[in-house]
UniProtKB/Swiss-Prot annotation:
Keyword Protein transport: no
Keywords on record: Glycolysis, Isomerase, Manganese, Metal-binding
GO biological process, one term: glucose catabolic process
Binding of Mn(2+) 1, residues: 408, 412, 467
Protein name per Swiss-Prot or TrEMBL: 2,3-bisphosphoglycerate-independent phosphoglycerate mutase
GO cellular component, as recorded: cytosol
Gene: gpmI
Gene Ontology molecular-function annotations: manganese ion binding; phosphoglycerate mutase activity
Catalysed reactions listed for this entry: (2R)-2-phosphoglycerate = (2R)-3-phosphoglycerate
Amino acid sequence: MDQSSGKGSGRDVGVAPVVLTILDGWGHRNDSEHNAIRQGDTPVMEALWHAYPHALIQASGSHVGLPDHQMGNSEVGHLTIGAGRIIRQELVRISDTVRDDQLNNTPALVELAEHLQNDTGTLHLLGLCSDGGVHSHVNHLCGLIHWAAAAGIKKVAVHAITDGRDTPTQSAMGSITLVQRAMEEAGVGHLASLCGRYWAMDRDKRWDRTEKAYDLYTDPTRSISDQSPQQLLAESYAAGITDEFLKPVRLSDDVMQDGDSVLVFNFRPDRARQIVQTLCLDDFDGFERRTTPKLDVVTFTQVEQDLPVSVAFPPEPLDDLLGQVVAEAGLRQYRTAETEKYPHVTYFMNGGIEQPLPGEERHLVPSPRVATYDLSPAMSADQLTDSCIDAIDQGTYSLIVINYANPDMVGHTGVMDAATEAIATVDRCIGRLLDAVGRRGGTMLITADHGNAELMQGPDGQAWTAHTTNPVPCILVEGEQRKLPGHGNDISLREDGGLADIAPTLLQILNLEQPAAMTGRSLIEPVSNVDPSPLSARLPLPV
């Protein structure tokens, strides 16, 4: 277990907490076919939906600073929730730069080009070759290839990581074809390796996976395949191995060597962090590296503070976030999740800041060590609930944020039976949390960061492992000691809201002033037809 807290924290005694419960990947879709949420056993959520103020809110596209019709994701969702405003996300920021042909005006890339123009080293472009838009975008890679040609960089090796998680499970060839076409048009570059994201993009310190990817990129003794990408993928599919799990394979003799440069074009940091650490840290100790070439590493965005890398698109600072407002009011807050979502309720929700805020305590519950989460659909939800109930019972935290990873992580496997079990587990845990909150007279705001588990099969009959653009539920369970001034229980939630409105809603419940920079609006509005009975008497909830 990992517990940490900020220094200089205030202390409340006997606090009625406000508990933000984020159901990661719990979207709304009316059709029950291929819908793990509709088919799962959810008596608690169904009862809450009918008894308390609720709404469907938006968690994708322009509502969270992404292009229209772009599915939301956990990083963007938690950042938007914490910021209380719509932020131009990195996908849009980088896409605009590529579209406007402005990569050559990016200082880190200018320096990189000058270095390679004066040296014999190779530029290695490493990242997820995908049009999913969650961690990267293939258009960015194609733009980099054209930029390299225009900058006079002669030797370019592309190390393509295949997706199959944020895209259909057998769709890699479409993106690879786009990259091959870009290299032909630019007259520079070749495909040096292929590797499924399962190996190259682990974020849970499963170093045996990362080691396989690292060896692929750096070990000169590894054999080179004489098959084309099309042949390799067809052979993989025939063996039941989809894009996400594609085994690492070298396609040329271009490995990373002393004096080479590496540009990691994933813009989302959480799944780029481990492979970047292996490439740039002298004191890396996750596994024993067979070779340690001296590389000049550039990342598209800040992967981690204090890494010895250049950053092409440095973070744009954010102020007056939810956590900051709570901390500045002298209130204590508690953030908890299991390993897979821990960075989201901490780092991402705090606007990319690693260190806890004053009065912020963090608690990490380890995720189970399994190959894929369909093998353990309950994940660590029960242990996570236990720890959160302990925090509620302490009576010292004004704001508690908890993330349940199951709908998203099990939804990504595409295994329907496992996903319905995951949904039932989370529903049961919500009931347990609700009892604890009710004992304290607190309030729960239940929502999700994006959709996933409500769609488990695509129109082509393949397992649907990606997120969705569906709206997500938001339910306000108001407690006796957190009644809103002037409203009592006579409230409802707006139907036109989005994730940017969650923080203003929480601040209203906490009776804290919303800062001007937080441009979202509280979802709460007065109405006269809500059951006025207290939380403890509203309905018997199954646990």
